C-alpha cells in the first residue's frame, strides 16, 4: 500500500522537486504553503498534486510528514501542531539522506552552479539509463526502476550532511549565506565535512587553491582549464550558438563536446559532468550526444523575446553569479547593450558583499536596482539601503519599482538581464506588460 506524504512548505524548490519525484513513483502526495504564487507550483499543479493553505486540519498521524527546513513551531502552525501531538516528522534533508540509499547517488555541491550542473548531469544520464533526479529549480523525476539518483546538495545550515553519495561534484566554494556562515573558513569546513562522506569519486574544480585542501577517503579528480588538472577542457570555441571544447584525461583526449550554453562557467559545469560519467564508465559518445540537447533549468539564463526585445531571467544573487551571467549574455549577444536589473536578496548578504556587488554589476553597460528583498529570517533595521549599492556602481545606475519600470525603455539594441532570488520576476512581468502595451498602441 502506497504511503501518503504531506509536505509542510511544498512550494520550496527542493520540496516541490521531491514531491514530484515521490508522486511519479506512485505515492500519494499533498502539501501546504502560502497563497503567494511561486514558480515551482506550476509543475505540482500540472501533476495534480494538492496544494493546501497552512492549517493544523491538514495533519493526521497516518501521514508521512516532511517539513521544509525554514519552518519552526514559532513560525508555522502545522509544525507546531505536529510537535504538540508528538507525531513523527522528518526535515527535507533528513528524508532525502535516507531516500537516496536505494540508488547509486550522484550529488552536486558548490556555492554556485549547483542547479545548472545538477540539471545537466540529470539530463545526460536519464537519456542513457533510467535515472531519478531532484533539481533545485523545483523539478524532479522519480522512477521505481532507476539505478541512479542525481541530486543537488545544499550547503546552507550544513543541510548536505545527511548525504553519503557514491559520487559528488564540488563546483566551487565562496562566502555566501552570511546569516549562517561566519566566513570562508566556515564554508570550507562544511564542504570538507561533506566531502568525507563521498564514497567512490569526488570531482572538484581544480583552479581554486582552497579546494585542494579538501580531503576524502574517495579518489579526488580535479577538473578545469589548466594542465595541472586531471580532466582538462581545451580547444574552446565560444560562439553565439554555445560552446565547443575537447576534454582530456591523463593527457589523452576522451571526446569532443558541444553545450548549447553560454559563459565559461557552463564549460566548467559540463567538464565536471563529463568527468563524473567517464569515471563511472559511461560511453562518451552518448554523453556528447545528449549534452547537445540540454535546454537548461528554470530561472538560469531563461530567455524570452517580446517584440524583438530579449529578456533574460536568472537566479543570480551573489557577485560571482552576476559576473558569470553577464559573461554569458555577452557571449550570446556580443553586439547588444547589456542592461542589468538586479534585486539584492537579504540585508545580511547585501551588507557583507556590498563592494563585490558593485564591482560585479559594473560589468553591465547599464544597471537598474530594485529594493532589497529581505528574507523571512531577518528584520530590516536600516543598516543598508539599495541606494548605498547604487552609489558604488561605476556604470550608469538607477532605481526602478514594480509600478514604474519605464526607465528601462531608454535603451536601443539592448538585452535586459533580470537577476535575483526574491520577487524580481514581478519587475520582469511589469516590463513585459509595458512592452506589450507599447506594441498594441503602435499597431
Swiss-Prot record:
Disulphide-bridged cysteine pairs: none
Highest rank taxon of the organism: Bacteria
Cellular compartments per GO CC: cytoplasm
Single GO molecular function: ATP binding
PANTHER family, sorted: UDP-N-ACETYLMURAMATE--L-ALANINE LIGASE, UDP-N-ACETYLMURAMATE--L-ALANINE LIGASE-RELATED
Function field: Cell wall formation.
Listed NCBIfam families: murC
Protein name, entry field: UDP-N-acetylmuramate--L-alanine ligase
Protein species of origin: Streptococcus agalactiae serotype Ia (strain ATCC 27591 / A909 / CDC SS700)
Encoding gene, per UniProt annotation: murC
